[in-house]
A protein has these predicted regions:
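Residues at or immediately preceding the N-termini of alpha-helices
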Residues: 24, 111-114, 118
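Flexible, low-complexity linker and terminal segments
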Residues: 117, 122-354
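A short small-residue
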Residues: 99-102, 206-208
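Active-site-proximal alpha-helical scaffold in enzymes
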Residues: 32-35, 39-42, 115-127
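Thiamine diphosphate
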Residues: 1-95, 101-103, 107-108, 336, ...
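Active-site-adjacent "lid/gating" segments in soluble enzymes
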Residues: 105-107, 113, 126
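C-terminal structured domain segments across diverse proteins
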Residues: 80-83, 115, 146
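Aromatic/hydrophobic pocket-lining residues that form the small-molecule binding cavity
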Residues: 53, 114, 265
Length: 354
C-alpha cells in the first residue's frame, strides 16, 4: 500500500500512470501489456498476490516480455499474518510458475540497495526480456531510516535490444524473428507493436521464431533452452550479487542472510569480532540465478556457517544446498513468529553454533 500511495503522489507529475486494479491478476497482466507496448511497468504485492500472479508471470516468461514485480513478504500461507514479518516467499518467487522458470530474483538488504536495485530491476527486465522479482520484507520495506545520500548519477537507463524503425533488422516485409534462436547471448531483438515491418506474434503457447504456435519437438527444446540460457548469464553481469562484510580470508564463522536481516547480523558480527573471532557476513542479493562462484569461496573457507532467515523450512539454506554441491554443513537459525530478530537473541544463537 505504501508503494501505491507514493506512486499516486509522484507518478503523474513525471508523466506516469498509477492504476489500482480490481485484483492482483489484473495488475500483473496490465503491467505485462504496458511493457509489451513499450512502457516501463511494474506491480507491487505481498505473498498472496504473488500466488495469484503466478500464471501471468509465466506468460511474461514465455513471451519474453519485461516485467518487474515487487514482493514485500509477510506471514503465510493464505491470509496468514498480513502485518507481520516473515521471509517465506523465497521458493515461491523463484519457482512460482508451472513449467521451467526463466526469471530473475533479486533481494536488496538495505535502504540504499533497495533504491539502486529496484531501478536496476527495470534494466534487467528489458535487457534479458523476462520477469524480475524484487524480494523484500516488512522490516526493510516499512522501516524508516536516514541515509547519507543517493547518487542519481548512477542511474543509467538500459533498454536492451529494442529495435527501432530504420535498423536493417526490420527492413524486410517478412515476419520478424522475435524469438530468433541464433541471437547473440540468446537474447533476441524486441520490436514494439506498430513498428513498420516488425510483424511478430506474442502468445503463451510454445512458438517458433516469429511467435507462431508450434508443437515441433526440436523447436520446443530450442526455445526452452533459449529462455533458460539467457537468464543464467545474469550471474556474470550483475554488479554485486552479494553484500560482503568479510574481512577474513578464512573465518571461524560465516553468517549468511537475505533482505532485512542485514542490520542485526552486522551488529552481531561486530560484537563477535571484538571478542577475537574471525566472523564474515554476506547477504545474498541475487537469488536467481544463484551466484554459486561468488558464495562458494566463503563457504569453503569457513569453519562454521549459519544461515539466518525468517521462515520455518530454512528456504535460503535449502537454496544454497541445491546450488552448491558438495555444500559444507549449514546451521539454520530460524524465526517465524511474526517478529524480527533482536541482537542479543541472534548473538546467543550464534554462540551456540560456535
Amino acid at each position: 500500500s505504501e508503494i501505491m500511495e507514493y506512486m499516486v503522489k509522484y507518478t503523474p507529475a513525471e508523466g506516469g500512470v498509477m492504476l489500482q486494479t480490481e485484483d492482483e491478476i489484473s495488475a500483473c497482466t496490465m503491467a505485462i501489456g504496458a511493457a509489451y507496448a513499450g512502457a516501463r511497468a511494474f506491480t507491487a504485492t505481498a505473498g498472496p498476490g504473488l500466488s495469484l500472479m503466478a500464471e501471468a508471470i509465466g506468460l511474461a516468461e514465455m513471451t519474453e516480455t519485461p516485467l518487474v514485480v515487487i514482493d514485500t513478504q509477510r506471514g503465510g500461507p493464505s491470509t496468514g499474518l498480513p502485518t507481520k514479518h516473515e521471509q517465506s516467499d523465497l521458493m515461491a518467487a523463484i519457482y512460482n510458475t508451472h513449467g521451467d522458470t526463466a526469471k530473475i530474483v533479486i533481494s536488496p538488504s538495505s535502504i540504499e540497495e533497495s533504491f539502486y536495485d529496484t531501478f536496476e530491476a527495470f534494466n534487467l527486465a528489458e535487457e534479458y526480456q523476462c520477469p524480475v522479482i524484487v524480494l523484500s520484507d516488512l522490516q526493510l520495506s516499512l522501516g524508516k531510516q536516514s541515509v547519507t545520500s543517493l547518487d542519481y548519477g548512477k542511474l543509467q537507463v538500459r533498454r536492451g535490444k529494442l529495435v527501432k524503425d530504420g535498423l536493417p533488422e526490420i527492413k524486410s516485409p517478412e515476419y520478424f524473428k522475435r524469438y530468433d534462436l541464433e541471437a547473440e547471448g540468446s537474447i533476441s531483438m524486441r520490436v514494439l507493436p506498430g513498428t513498420p515491418n516488425g510483424i511478430s506474434l506474442g502468445t503463451g503457447l510454445e512458438h517458433d521464431e516469429v511467435g507462431r504456435p508450434s508443437e515441433n519437438r526440436a523447436m520446443r527444446t530450442a526455445q526452452s533452452d533459449k529462455r533458460l540460457r539467457k537468464v543464467r548469464s545474469v550471474v556474470d553481469t550483475f554488479e554485486s550479487p552479494l553484500y560482503e562484510d568479510a574481512p577474513y580470508p578464512q573465518s571461524d564463522l560465516l553468517i549468511i542472510g537475505m533482505a532485512g536481516t542485514r542490520a542485526v547480523i552486522s551488529e552481531v558480527a561486530e560484537e563477535l569480532r571484538e571478542k577475537g573471532l574471525r566472523v564474515n557476513h554476506v547477504q545474498i542479493r541475487l537469488l536467481s540465478p544463484f551466484p554459486v562462484c561468488a558464495l562458494n569461496h566463503y563457504l569453503q573457507e569457513a569453519k562454521k556457517i549459519v544461515v539466518v532467515e525468517h521462515n520455518a523450512t530454512a528456504q535460503l539454506a535449502r537454496l544454497i544446498k541445491m546450488n552448491v554441491p558438495p555444500c559444507p554443513e549449514l546451521h539454520s537459525i530460524l524465526k517465524y513468529n511474526g517478529d524480527i530478530f533482536y541482537k542479543e537473541e541472534l548473538l546467543a544463537k550464534c554462540k551456540e553454533v560456535l
